[in-house]
Structure formats: C-alpha cells, structure tokens
Amino acid sequence: MAAGVSSRMKNSVSSSKITSDLINQSNTRVKGFIEVGNRKEPFIYYIINNCIKADIRDFYIILSNNSKEFQKYLRNLEKKLSININFAFQDFYGREKPLGTSDAIFQTMNQYEELKNNRFLVCNCDNLYSTKAIKLLVNE
C-alpha cells in the first residue's frame, strides 16, 4: 500500500545526518517512494524484490490519484522485473489524508473483484518484510 502521506515521518525529520535531498523527498513523496540504500532505489523496490524472491509475481499497488510519477516508475519496474502490477486508486473522500489500511484494502477489492474470492498478502509500503517472512505467510 502506497497511498499514505507519511505525516508522522515528515514531522520527525531533525537529524543532522539526513541529507537535504532526503528531507525534500520526505516532504514531497509518499514513504514507499523515498530513495534508500546505496542503490538509491525507492523503498517499495525492496519490498517488491523480496516478494519476487518469495515467488510472488502479481502485485496490486494502492496509490492516490495524483501519483503519475510513481505510476511511471512502477510501470518501468514492471517491465524490468517481468512482473504484473495492477494499480488501485484510493479515494480520500475530500480529506487531506486517506482513511487507512482497511479502507485502502476495501477500495482495492471493489476495483478488482478477483480479490474477493482469493487469498492475498498485504504489505504496507513503509515496512520491509523479509523473503522468509513472506514465504511463511504465503505458505500458511
């Protein structure tokens, strides 16, 4: 899920070790698209990569409607990694921030009927799940 606005993180950026670029990203991007690590890949890349290592190839990524830059990145990643990415768009119902995880899942299930009759794994975009943990959940 990648539609959250990272308000708690934006209010806690105060370390002198944080670069101005990272501060700018935290103020202009959702958490999952902030670049991390030596590769400077968005955080969501590492989540997707661990899912691929756990044999997951189909993804439903929840975004806000104003996420064209992220959609472009994800379409390029989809081609590069030979995976399938479906976008769901979370309606904020006129609010500044989305309602939360359960609402995001509910809206996605309404946009993709096949999810109503199948098992799926939910990964928040601000947590890095190990390949081992993903495999355990998938095989449960």
PLM regions: where:
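Conserved N-terminal catalytic core of the sugar/cofactor nucleotidyltransferase
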Residues: 6-27, 35-119
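Conserved donor-nucleotide/metal-binding helix-loop-beta segment in metal-dependent transferases, i.e.
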Residues: 131-140
